[in-house]
Design a protein with these regions (language model features):
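Secretory/export targeting leaders with adjacent low-complexity proregions
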Residues: 1-152, 158-162
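C-terminal soluble interaction/assembly domains
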Residues: 153-179
Length: 180
């Protein structure tokens, strides 16, 4: 549909974890997934997926968003609620990763001198993205991690396992900021 040209993808079958591996002592499917995709064996990079169309024509598209920065933000958050034109809503939940490392778009733009910290808001990042098409691949190569999603009936949950609250909850890396 015009205006919605940027897909989010479900987890490709070749990346699906072997859930038979899961035992009660492991959380699933994330830990099982980590057994499938190892850093030495990464899947397509973000640039290959977003710019080169590595997943096109595979019927993996779950939904189409209006701007590539919106897809990046959803991946950064790890899950979210999609609002469709017909008024329905659907949870897009974390399903897996491509095995590459990722980084904050704001952090990258600040460190590379592209944006001052004062302008590194989502609005500022979107403005930068729209006005620098020739620099997009450099960012996507620097942050090549990719998040795949699944539809779910449950409300999105954060790292601590609690339901997320709109405008209150935020994404954190427990290696940097302890939970709780």
């Amino acid at each position: 549909k015009p205006g919605y040209e940027y897909p989010i993808y479900r987890l490709p079958e070749e990346l699906a974890p072997d859930l038979a591996w899961c035992l009660p002592t492991h959380s699933c499917p994330e830990e099982a997934f980590l057994q499938v995709i190892k850093p030495e064996d990464p899947y397509y990079s973000r640039a290959a997926i977003d710019l080169d169309g590595a997943l096109k024509n595979r019927n993996l598209e779950m939904a189409w968003l209006g701007h590539p920065v919106e897809t990046y933000d959803l991946m950064l958050e790890g899950s979210g609620i999609l609002a469709f034109d017909d008024g329905t809503q659907q949870a897009a939940l974390f399903a897996g990763l491509n095995g590459h490392s990722g980084q904050s778009m704001a952090g990258y733009l600040i460190r590379s001198g592209e944006l001052p910290r004062s302008k590194a808001s989502m609005k500022g990042i979107r403005r930068w993205w729209d006005s620098h098409p020739q620099k997009r691949r450099a960012f996507l190569n620097a942050s090549s991690g990719y998040v795949f999603f699944r539809f779910g009936a449950e409300h999105p949950k954060g790292t601590a396992g609690c339901e997320l609250t709109p405008w209150v909850s935020m994404a954190v890396d427990p290696r940097v900021l302890p939970l709780g």
